[in-house]
Regions:
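Peripheral terminal appendages
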Residues: 1-38, 68-84, 151-154, 182, ...
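ATP-dependent adenylation/nucleotidyltransferase module used to activate substrates
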Residues: 1-213
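Local cysteine-cluster metal-coordination motifs and their immediate loop/turn environment
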Residues: 134-135, 226-239
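Short amphipathic alpha-helical interaction segments
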Residues: 198, 222-225, 247
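Immediate flanking context of iron-sulfur cluster ligation sites
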Residues: 214-227
Length: 324
């Protein structure tokens, strides 16, 4: 049993999805005050203006949803990102990997990196459990979070618990993760432990705690998407690609055009257009107000619903893909 009271900082890697939400709610159930819990959202498309962000991979409503969630529960929220997000990294052609930035508690923004060796990608991350091939997870989430911890002096000489929502049920790869272990940022100068409190949970348990707290999850779940984070996740099944094509035809076409331009597909054998042709759109893909909600960067819906209004979303218990 992890003694939550002994940590100076508790951080939650918060995508806005069901599993990271369940991990946050678990902390509340254990008596941790919400103001002690920092929600860390790694923006896979980058963050901010002036070329710092794209709109290729994630839901436009996600940043606003995360802000509303944090505001409702009165928990601090900090964004972190690689400049230009996945799209800039994917389009690297004889250039260095972009810098990493993060928000500090005083409102300032820290930045590091961007001066590494020059290289070329010109292809999407590939479907693989190998992080060097599936570089989206490492370059846009894992490395970003680690840089934000290593470059903030407030963690030096302190004890930090970094919580993430991976579950064993998701894949054989994630089943091998340890529930509790030293984080990659742990050193003689700072103590950082990684804790996966929902690792052994079945999906039903995730929905049970969300129902009990009456949390209105991200609209993507109501459309029928079984996972959040990247709406254009490279592990998406045929139905997900068919749904994305219906929800955001222009965004889908941009991805298809990149596959043609690169001469490499996301899936090793099949282009996204063919995969979409083989799938069926989710139930909510014909609900235009719901689609508009998911695509709204100024999302302002409620986070807590009346008990009689909470219903399990269309995306529950669906095929979500993920690292094998």
């Amino acid at each position: 049993m992890v003694n939550l009271a002994e940590y100076d900082f508790i951080l939650v890697a918060f995508s806005g999805g069901k599993d990271s939400t369940a991990a946050f709610l678990y902390l509340l159930d254990k008596g941790v005050a919400p103001e002690r819990i920092e929600l860390w959202h790694h923006s896979v498309d980058g963050h901010g203006g002036n070329g710092a962000a794209s709109s290729l991979m994630d839901w436009p409503s996600t940043p606003a949803y995360c802000k509303a969630f944090a505001r409702t529960f009165q928990a601090p929220l900090y964004f972190s990102w690689r400049l230009g997000g996945l799209e800039r990294e994917m389009l690297r052609n004889g250039t260095a990997t972009a810098p990493i930035s993060w928000e500090n508690p005083d409102g300032s923004v820290g930045t590091t990196g961007g001066k590494g060796p020059k290289g070329t990608r010109l292809k999407f991350p590939q479907v693989s459990a190998d992080l060097s091939t599936r570089w989206c997870s490492s370059y846009l989430k894992i490395d970003v979070g680690a840089a934000a911890i290593r470059n903030q002096e407030r963690f030096l000489g302190k004890k930090t618990l970094f919580i993430s929502g991976e579950r064993a049920e998701e894949s054989p790869c994630r089943a091998r993760y340890k529930v509790f272990e030293p984080d990659r940022t742990c050193s003689d100068r700072r103590t950082v432990h990684r804790y996966r409190p929902v690792h052994s949970w079945k999906e039903q348990e995730v929905w049970d705690i969300i129902r009990r707290h009456r949390v209105n999850l991200h609209p993507a779940y109501r459309i029928g998407f079984p996972r959040l984070s990247c709406r254009a996740c490279i592990f998406g099944q045929e139905d997900q690609w068919a749904s994305l094509r219906q929800v955001d035809p222009a965004g889908f076409q941009t991805i298809a055009d990149y596959e043609t331009k690169f001469g490499f597909t996301i899936h090793r054998k099949t282009a996204v257009g063919d995969r979409a042709d083989a799938g069926r759109p989710y139930a909510g893909c014909s609900d235009q107000p719901l689609i508009a909600e998911a695509m709204d960067p100024d999302w302002n819906g409620p986070i807590i619903l009346p008990e009689e209004e909470w219903v399990i979303p269309n995306g529950a218990f669906g095929q979500g893909g993920g690292p094998s």
